[in-house]
Swiss-Prot record:
Upper lineage: Bacteria, Bacillati, Bacillota, Bacilli, Bacillales
The keyword Endoplasmic reticulum is assigned to this record: no
InterPro entries in the cross-refs: FAD/NAD-bd_sf, FAD/NAD-linked_Rdtase_dimer_sf, Pyr_nucl-diS_OxRdtase_dimer
Record-linked Gene3D superfamilies: 3.30.390.30, FAD/NAD(P)-binding domain
Protein name: Uncharacterized 19.7 kDa protein in mercuric resistance operon
Naturally occurring in which organism (per UniProt): Staphylococcus aureus
Keywords: Plasmid
SUPFAM superfamilies recorded: FAD/NAD(P)-binding domain, FAD/NAD-linked reductases, dimerisation (C-terminal) domain
Length: 180
């Protein structure tokens, strides 16, 4: 594309946009997903969220700003891997009082009943605020289970509250309380 001809300024990772996903150099151009230079991760759900912001701003004028709350990600290998929030290194460097809960859970019933060869988790908890700040999972259910951790981080659900939840059993979600 000849972006210069359209007076569209670009950065290393895409079109230089403002908080409305509008080009900073050509107000008639909007960009979303991987085409936009934003803080969003190059993931399909981020591109989808961006597209909703762009559509709203095209139809209603620049009234909706892009926000990137907690964004979970998954790798669809066998077993699946998923993460959300801070890495262990980021959490420890954040100055918070971090507790790391980590375990191979291949022998838990949830995973034995489906003949999984390997399942494990690492959950990072800010002990002073009883908040999850990161979660990293490996299992066949990791892609679904990570969304529960993303919800907890996004809405500040405490580990105490999560432990009180009653989930359907036997499901991967029913194991959350034992991961905290």
């Amino acid at each position: 594309m000849n972006l210069e001809k359209g007076n569209i300024e670009r950065k290393k990772h895409g079109v230089h946009v403002n908080e409305y996903l509008q080009s900073v150099s050509n107000p008639n151009v909007y960009a979303a997903g991987d085409a936009a230079a934003t803080d969003g991760l190059p993931l399909t759900p981020v591109a989808s969220a961006d597209s909703h912001v762009v559509a709203s701003n095209l139809l209603k004028g620049n009234s909706k700003k892009i926000e990137y709350p907690v964004i979970p990600s998954a790798v669809f290998t066998v077993p699946k891997m998923a993460s959300v929030g801070m890495s262990e290194e980021e959490a420890k460097n954040s100055g918070r009082n971090i507790k790391v809960k980590q375990k191979n859970i291949s022998d838990w019933f949830t995973y034995k009943r489906t003949n999984e060869d390997f399942a494990a988790f690492k959950v990072l908890i800010d002990e002073d605020h009883d908040q999850i700040v990161g979660a990293h999972l490996i299992s066949n259910e990791a892609d679904e289970l990570i969304n529960h951790f993303a919800t907890a981080i996004r809405f500040g659900i405490s580990t105490k509250e999560l432990k009180q939840m009653i989930f359907a059993y036997p499901t991967a979600a029913s194991d959350i309380a034992h991961m905290l």
